[in-house]
Amino acid sequence: MTKKVWKFYGIALLAVVIDQVLKLWVYFNMQMGTLGQIKLLGNWFKLFYTLNPGMAFGIQFGFTYDKVLLTIIRIIATSMIIKYIWNLAKETNSSKWLLWGWSLILGGAAGNGIDSIFYGKILHNAPYGAPMSWFYGQVIDMLYIDLWSGRLPDWVPWYSGYYVTCLPVFNLADVAILAGVALIVLDKRASIQQPVQKYEATEVTDSELLETRHELVDPITEHNNTEHNHPEVEDK
């Protein structure tokens, strides 16, 4: 069992290592913004170095100490996932895809958590005005699918003139989290379909058994009816 658990912890660790290697490469080799972008697939897919002070895909809570709360949530969530994988791996009939999914989520959460906890101090990328360097690191994002970007027209309420992109810039940790969620959803759908198939198979089996029972009962009934129609004549 221990070997099985560490196998999936190893998957999470591999996701963290790959994520951190790419982030550090971007940090030391790329210029932030449009001037430093690297086109990988024409104008559609690029490496675009940017910093994200919030959660995955740039989501933020929007108050002064949201970064501290976010980091605490990441630490708690990571600890809970570690424990959950341990318990799940101990089950003899645990799904491999479910373990893969949670391992990828663990790797993604830990990868972005490292940025939040350490990068503000080590890479000095904490936002201006942050009360401390620790726990205020900004997550390094670099993967950009450029489907559309531009400024919203003036007639758009509340957000007129804002520069927006169709998809936010993300990183490999975000990809790992999304892939993990997808595997869990697929596993759940498969587990829902299996009982239905099993029930249908049981219905067929019960039907066959009922038919067999009728075949066994009918000769007995016919024999009883014959005796009833032709009673024995008593000797006088």
UniProtKB/Swiss-Prot annotation:
This enzyme's EC code(s): 3.4.23.36
Compartment list: Cell inner membrane
Active site: D141, D174
Pathway the protein contributes to: Protein modification; lipoprotein biosynthesis (signal peptide cleavage)
GO MF, one annotated term: aspartic-type endopeptidase activity
EC main group: hydrolase
Catalyzed reactions per annotation: Release of signal peptides from bacterial membrane prolipoproteins. Hydrolyzes -Xaa-Yaa-Zaa-|-(S,diacylglyceryl)Cys-, in which Xaa is hydrophobic (preferably Leu), and Yaa (Ala or Ser) and Zaa (Gly or Ala) have small, neutral side chains
GO terms under biological process: proteolysis
Stored Pfam families: Peptidase_A8
Ranges annotated as spanning the membrane: 8-28, 44-64, 68-88, 98-118, 166-186
InterPro entries: Peptidase_A8
Membrane association type: Multi-pass membrane protein
Chief location category: membrane
GO CC annotation terms, alphabetical: plasma membrane
Taxonomic superkingdom: Bacteria
Keywords: Aspartyl protease, Cell inner membrane, Cell membrane, Hydrolase, Membrane, Protease, Transmembrane, Transmembrane helix
Family membership: Belongs to the peptidase A8 family.
Function: This protein specifically catalyzes the removal of signal peptides from prolipoproteins.
Protein name in UniProt: Lipoprotein signal peptidase
Source organism (scientific name): Amoebophilus asiaticus (strain 5a2)
Lineage: Bacteria, Pseudomonadati, Bacteroidota, Cytophagia, Cytophagales
